């Protein structure tokens, strides 16, 4: 099927490189990669033409997701992340209510208070992110055959003893 590109030999080198980047991402987060097993559960290609856009969504069935830009022109749409929780919102509604800006309370929209974050990506870039992050692509762009390879990854404990919040090793699962 189209959701298992990682099983296609033509993509084996690319996916080996992506795996290295995923390991770096995990280490960057301070996670001991010796204690977990990492599974790529799905991987697929998306071709975008014209004004097509990907609506905001999450990959709730996995832990880590990625998008690798195999083909991308400067005019093609970028990936966008949507802030659902407004972690820096110290006053309720200050970042979402238009009157706060109109009334001069909020002086500017910036990286720390924006509802959406547009990540400028170029061809051969990869974006790795938590699967729970709400994301999509920009609208009103003229895509010229943008091709991205995306995938989902699951992290499982090698030894789940005394761990409440990790999935136990797959070899201990029982199919019902």
What are these regions (language model features)?
Residues 70, 133, 153-155:
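Short beta-strand segments enriched in hydrophobic/aromatic residues
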Residues 31-43:
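A short coil-to-beta-strand element that immediately follows conserved catalytic motifs
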Residues 43-45, 66-68, 149-153:
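A structural signal for short, well-ordered beta-strand segments
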Residues 48-126, 145, 159-165:
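Catalytic core of non-heme Fe(II) oxygenases with the double-stranded beta-helix
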Residues 1-32, 46, 53, 78, 142-176, ...:
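Non-heme Fe(II)/2-oxoglutarate
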